[in-house]
């Protein structure tokens, strides 16, 4: 007999494309309890493959299929690590919620429905792990006229909401997004703000060969170029009204290079560009907080950007009167929030309960999200 209880695994590989974050969560209590956590870095070749698949290219179907196989093996490695940490067997887990790697996200375009594509091989993961897998969470919301993103605001409300005050939860991954949590009975809203770490990671990789800017130290050594910042913020996405979502297929290296190419004036140092990109991330978030969450007095940050001290300081400067904290101040590691969300979404699917918030995504209504791949 399988003694699964209410234990689920959530695995998230986000737009930063640095690897997979995974958690084993017990939902039997009042709050989710993380029993184990793991991070599995992507091999360089897999990260490069997913980077190339963000934009049109040759032989995409073949390359995506092989990348999906490789990702399933990375995810299966996470599962093995989690079970070992917790001293559990595959039969002790109800399901895995596997997000996959977003390679295109274009809801509402082309034919009014558009599409979103997360590369992965859930059937292979189920085969390797011996656990039911729930995947493809976003497409059902898109089919209902929604953006398919963000999907974590419902969990943000459960973990960080407070009936006594309005709060904002901000995830800074490759793309940044916010969840506005009202302090009353008002509706939760959420949307993508713009680039988070994606362009920062690209630029430091190109210039210094480093995967990321540790604590934002390189950005802090440069100066913000106001002309370049204004050119970036002139992109129509920043002034579009929510619900809205975006991805690396908009904010990609060519997007940055085009703005650098049209800039006039004295030459910028590479560190100046990095400082300006960090300022772009912070300013896009701050603008949206001011426009859509004016009563909020607390901004709670998660994701890799929460460890970028330069961005965090810029946020505090741009939002006077707002306490800027991280989810770790509330007992949740910054790297675990989205993985917990996909464990929760898998549970919602198996229980046939909605996983989206229609006021966030713009969908026609609540929908059960995900497709089930039995073990």
Curated annotation (Swiss-Prot):
InterPro entries: Anhydro_N_Ac-Mur_kinase, ATPase_NBD. It holds the Pfam family AnmK. The keyword Heme does not apply. Keywords: ATP-binding, Carbohydrate metabolism, Kinase, Nucleotide-binding, Transferase. Pathway: Amino-sugar metabolism; 1,6-anhydro-N-acetylmuramate degradation; Cell wall biogenesis; peptidoglycan recycling. GO terms for biological process: 1,6-anhydro-N-acetyl-beta-muramic acid catabolic process; amino sugar metabolic process; peptidoglycan turnover. ATP binds at residues 14-21. Gene3D superfamilies: 3.30.420.40. It is an enzyme of class 2 (transferase). GO terms for molecular function: ATP binding; kinase activity; phosphotransferase activity, alcohol group as acceptor. It catalyses: 1,6-anhydro-N-acetyl-beta-muramate + ATP + H2O = N-acetyl-D-muramate 6-phosphate + ADP + H(+). Its EC number is 2.7.1.170. SUPFAM superfamilies: Actin-like ATPase domain. Transmembrane segments: none annotated. Catalyzes the specific phosphorylation of 1,6-anhydro-N-acetylmuramic acid (anhMurNAc) with the simultaneous cleavage of the 1,6-anhydro ring, generating MurNAc-6-P. Is required for the utilization of anhMurNAc either imported from the medium or derived from its own cell wall murein, and thus plays a role in cell wall recycling. Belongs to the anhydro-N-acetylmuramic acid kinase family. PANTHER family: ANHYDRO-N-ACETYLMURAMIC ACID KINASE. This is Anhydro-N-acetylmuramic acid kinase. It comes from Cupriavidus pinatubonensis (strain JMP 134 / LMG 1197) (Cupriavidus necator (strain JMP 134)). The gene is anmK.
């Amino acid at each position: 007999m399988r003694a699964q209880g209410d234990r689920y695994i959530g695995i998230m590989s986000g737009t930063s494309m640095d690897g997979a974050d995974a958690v084993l969560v017990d939902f039997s209590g009042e709050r989710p309890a993380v029993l184990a956590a793991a991070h599995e870095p992507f091999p360089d070749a897999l990260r490069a493959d997913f980077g190339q698949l963000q934009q049109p290219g040759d032989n995409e179907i073949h390359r995506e299929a092989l990348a999906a196989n490789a990702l399933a093996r990375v995810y299966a490695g996470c599962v093995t690590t989690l079970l070992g940490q917790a001293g559990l067997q595959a039969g002790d887990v109800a399901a895995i919620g596997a997000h996959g790697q977003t390679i295109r996200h274009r809801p509402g375009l082309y034919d009014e429905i558009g599409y979103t594509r997360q590369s992965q091989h859930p059937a292979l993961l189920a085969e390797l792990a011996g656990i039911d897998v729930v995947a493809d969470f976003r497409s059902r919301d898109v089919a209902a006229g929604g953006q398919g993103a963000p999907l974590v605001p419902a969990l943000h409300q459960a973990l960080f909401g407070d009936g006594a005050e309005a709060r904002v939860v901000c995830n800074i991954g490759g793309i940044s997004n916010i969840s506005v949590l009202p302090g009353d009975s008002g509706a939760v809203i959420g949307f993508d703000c713009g680039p988070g770490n994606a362009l920062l990671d690209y630029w430091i990789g190109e210039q210094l060969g480093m995967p990321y800017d540790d604590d934002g130290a390189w950005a802090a050594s440069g100066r913000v170029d106001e002309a370049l910042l204004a050119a970036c913020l002139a992109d129509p996405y920043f002034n579009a009204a929510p619900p809205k979502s975006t991805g690396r297929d908009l904010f990609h290296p060519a997007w940055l290079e085009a703005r650098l190419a049209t800039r006039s004036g004295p030459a910028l140092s590479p560190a100046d560009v990095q400082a300006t990109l960090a300022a772009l991330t912070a300013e896009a978030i701050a603008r949206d907080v001011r426009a859509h969450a004016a009563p909020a007095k607390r901004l709670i940050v998660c994701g890799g950007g929460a460890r970028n001290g330069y961005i965090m300081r810029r946020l505090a400067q741009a939002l006077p009167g707002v306490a800027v904290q991280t989810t770790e101040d509330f007992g949740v590691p910054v790297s675990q929030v989205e993985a917990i969300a996909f464990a929760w979404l898998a549970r919602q699917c198996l229980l046939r309960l909605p996983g989206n918030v229609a006021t966030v995504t713009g969908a026609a209504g609540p929908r059960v999200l995900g497709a089930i791949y039995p073990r």
